[in-house]
UniProtKB/Swiss-Prot annotation:
The name this protein goes by in its record: DENN domain-containing protein 10
Subunit structure, as described in the record: Interacts with the coiled-coil heterodimer of CCDC22 and CCDC93; the interaction is direct. Interacts with RAB27A and RAB27B (GDP-bound forms preferentially).
Superkingdom per UniProt: Eukaryota
Protein source organism: Mus musculus (Mouse)
Any one annotated GO CC term: late endosome
Chain ranges of the cDENN domain: 152-299
Domain spans labelled uDENN: 1-136
Protein family (similarity comment): Belongs to the DENND10 family.
Keywords: Endosome, Guanine-nucleotide releasing factor
GO biological process: endosome transport via multivesicular body sorting pathway; protein transport; regulation of early endosome to late endosome transport
Gene that produces this protein: Dennd10
Keyword Repeat among UniProt keywords: no
Function according to Swiss-Prot or TrEMBL: Guanine nucleotide exchange factor (GEF) regulating homeostasis of late endocytic pathway, including endosomal positioning, maturation and secretion, possibly through activating Rab proteins such as RAB27A and RAB27B. Promotes the exchange of GDP to GTP, converting inactive GDP-bound RAB27A and RAB27B into their active GTP-bound form.
Length: 357
């Protein structure tokens, strides 16, 4: 239990409250501890209370410069002690990706605020979780951090759903992720964007890297600047204008129209060949097997990925300084792989930082 407590102390960063009053104005009301103006503005943008379309999004999550944010928004019933407040959002910031964990905790904080109308009671529960990993209340529900394993969050999405929508084209997404390319996903509904984008890193399970995920972006200068500092990423947008920003992506996924487009500048690195066809067929075959769970499909793809790395092994050598493993490009060329395979292996080595600088 002590390890769990220590972990939560290190993972949770802060809690905040945004209210919308009866005049329709959304305001940042309170936070603990203090936060920066830029993060505050970002979170005001992410909570749906500043949206003009008045659509309520019960829960959204995303990442900004390695800080994860989780926002739960509720409508205030007439019976509540909160007067002149029509809606409010509870915001949690943390170092880890775990939407289910923070959705559960923010829901409890929402119930507490609806009942008492004071941030003090919320802060008590926040500090209890921060220091002990648990908060208990008969009327508002209990929360235990250790119930929410980080690996379960990685496996919560459905690879099968992605394959049923895109079929063989799923291999484009797999290739883009293997090569650490920039993937932008568009859908007008944020829930669809988040469900789809959170699942994609599982296609490269060997990395288990969800820091590449930016599931809720706006075409806002500060956000885009943070995004463009990343080498490869998965970025989700609800603004269709992002399709006119080829500077932001190598692969564009229009989720609403089930279309995947490779940007002209990425076409050379993303050339598909026999190897990609094999990978695509394996992904489709595994995903369409009714006996297999999503985690088994992920396992099948991971095994195929491991096999791809064995293709690189014979052409890899330890660098002269005895440090990292680098690719012997000449040895790769002498193997006379089909051009698309050689091209892919070369770009994969580049993505894995195996090229001699």
């Amino acid at each position: 239990m002590a390890a769990v407590v220590a972990m939560d102390t290190q993972l949770m960063l802060g809690v905040g409250l945004i209210e919308k009053d009866s005049n329709g104005e959304a305001l940042w009301v309170w936070c603990y501890p203090s936060t920066t103006a830029s993060l505050r503005n970002l979170l005001l943008r992410k909570c749906c209370l500043t949206d003009e379309n008045k659509l309520l999004h019960p829960f959204v999550f995303g990442q900004y410069r390695r800080t994860w944010f989780y926002v739960t928004t509720v409508e205030v019933p007439d019976s509540s002690v909160l007067k002149k407040v029509t809606h409010f959002s509870i915001v949690l910031t943390a170092k880890d990706f775990n939407p289910e964990k923070y959705a559960a905790f923010t829901r409890i904080l929402c119930r507490i605020y609806l009942k008492y109308g004071s941030p003090v009671k919320m802060m008590e529960s926040y500090i209890a979780v921060l220091t002990k990993g648990i908060c208990q209340s008969e009327e508002n529900g209990s929360f235990l951090s250790r119930d929410f394993d980080g690996r379960k969050a990685y496996l919560a999405g459905s690879i099968k759903d992605i394959v049923s929508q895109f079929g063989m084209e799923t291999v484009i997404l797999h290739t883009a992720l293997m090569l650490k390319k920039r993937i932008v996903v568009y859908h007008p509904k944020i829930e669809a964007v988040q469900e789809f984008t959170r699942t994609l890193p599982a296609l490269v399970w060997h990395r288990q890297d969800w820091t590449i995920l930016h599931s809720y972006m706006h075409l806002h200068a500060e956000e885009l600047e943070g995004l463009q500092m990343c080498t490869g990423y998965i970025a989700g947008f609800v603004e269709l204008e992002v399709s006119n920003r080829p500077d932001l992506y190598d692969v564009f996924v229009n989720l609403a129209d089930s279309e995947i487009t490779i940007a002209p500048l990425a076409k050379e690195a993303m050339t598909m060949g026999k190897l990609h066809k094999e990978i695509g067929q394996l992904i489709v075959q595994s995903a369409e097997d009714p006996e297999k769970s999503d985690s088994q499909v992920i396992q099948d793809i991971a095994l195929k990925t491991k096999e791809i790395f064995t293709h690189l092994a014979p052409f890899s050598e330890v660098s002269d300084d005895g440090g990292k493993v680098i690719l012997n490009v000449e040895a790769l060329k002498q193997q006379r792989f089909p051009p698309a395979t050689e091209n892919f292996l070369y770009h994969l080595a580049a993505a894995e930082q195996m090229l001699k600088v």
